Each structure stands twice: as structure tokens, then as C-alpha cells.
Amino acid sequence: MGALGLEGRGGRLQGRGSLLLAVAGATSLVTLLLAVPITVLAVLALVPQDQGGLVTETADPGAQAQQGLGFQKLPEEEPETDLSPGLPAAHLIGAPLKGQGLGWETTKEQAFLTSGTQFSDAEGLALPQDGLYYLYCLVGYRGRAPPGGGDPQGRSVTLRSSLYRAGGAYGPGTPELLLEGAETVTPVLDPARRQGYGPLWYTSVGFGGLVQLRRGERVYVNISHPDMVDFARGKTFFGAVMVG
């Protein structure tokens, strides 16, 4: 009985010892398996890499610090630039010509010529390329009523302003009428004024429209009463702008 009891206890002790050894071994194995990938990941996180997997070398310590922290320098954006050519355009302002009536100013106040347009009082406005243009013209007029008496119809005056083109592909023939406007003015007489001219009157003739023009064609203005043109600021002008 005594011998058997000791033997049974010894067997149980040996079994418990084997179990403890097995548990300790398994724990060590799991710890080792977890430690290896964690160590590898930590090393990879500390090594600077570019997008292709190669380590980049820079002489700038600040750049090295940025790369080590995982920052990337973005490329600088170039400012947007409109490289398309400007459309031909012109705006001319009426100016008096000595002994010739109406002339045109190309540089003063709001007047301009752009993108190859040219102008001369002798030949008119020349446009540099074929296209659809919007042409416009406004001519201001002023005058005085004649002395009192007489037929009212005899006091009426018809003011006419026209745009013509000539030259270029159109040829050297007779100029072609493009656009025209007209206004008839009948000054009101002052019954009390029997002698001398009446008060000043003012009016304007304006028009505009789309015209297909070719390179080299010249556009000019023709008016019926150059001695009545109003040259005050903003009263008389003409121009063109390419729209297609």
C-alpha cells in the first residue's frame, strides 16, 4: 500500500511537469513568431523609401528630415497662360480734319487697334484675316434752325451715315455699301425769333451688324453732312470686332 501510493504520486508529479514544460515551450514559440514580424516592420518603417522602393539621397538636411517623416514635396504648378491669339478689333473716335471734315483718331481716349488691324484716313480700316465681324458706327450731328419764315419742309435735313468696303478680295471696283443709317431733322422755329438762326439741335445716327469680310478688305465711313458732325466726347465713333 505504501509503495503503490508513492508510485502513484510520483506519476502524477511527472505528468504535471511534462505539461508545464509543454506550455512553456509553446509560449516561447508564439512569442518568437510574433517578435520576428514586428521587428521587421519596425526596421522597414525607419528606412526612407521612394515610390520605386529605392532610398533617395539628398544633401539638404531639411529634405532628409521630410523624407524620413514620410513627406513628399509636391511639384510646383505653373501659372495658366492664355496662348491663343487675340481676335482682331478696332475702335476709332471721330476727330475733325482741317478742310476735310470727319477724320478718325486711333490712340486717344478709348480708341485702339489690336491684333494686326490697320487704319489710315485715306484708305480706311484694314482687317488682317477672313472672318465674321461685327461692325458698328455712331455719328452725332448738331445744327441750328434757319431764320424764321418759309416752308417748314425747306428747313428739314436728312442726315445719312454709311459703312462701305473696298479693296482686298472684293477687288478695285466700286465700293460696296455694307450698312447705313439715316435721320431726318426738322428744326422747330421760335415764333418770336424773326431774324437770325434758331437754337442748336442735336441728334445722332447709329447702326451695327454682322458682315463677312476677307483679309485686306478696307472699311470706311461716308457721311452726308461733315460740317454738322458733333465731335464732343462719346458722340462719334466706329469700329469692328471679329466674332467668328
From Swiss-Prot:
Changing E109R: In subunit 1; reduces binding of LTA(1)-LTB(2) to LTBR and abolishes LTBR-mediated NF-kappa-B signaling activation. In subunit 2; reduces binding of LTA(1)-LTB(2) to LTBR and abolishes LTBR-mediated NF-kappa-B signaling activation. It comes from Homo sapiens. PROSITE patterns: THD_1 (PS00251), THD_2 (PS50049). The chain crosses the membrane at residues 19-48. CDD domains: TNF. The gene is LTB. GO terms for biological process: cell surface receptor signaling pathway; cell-cell signaling; gene expression; immune response; lymph node development; positive regulation of canonical NF-kappaB signal transduction; positive regulation of extrinsic apoptotic signaling pathway; positive regulation of interleukin-12 production. Its main location: membrane. Belongs to the tumor necrosis factor family. It is found in: Membrane. This is Lymphotoxin-beta.
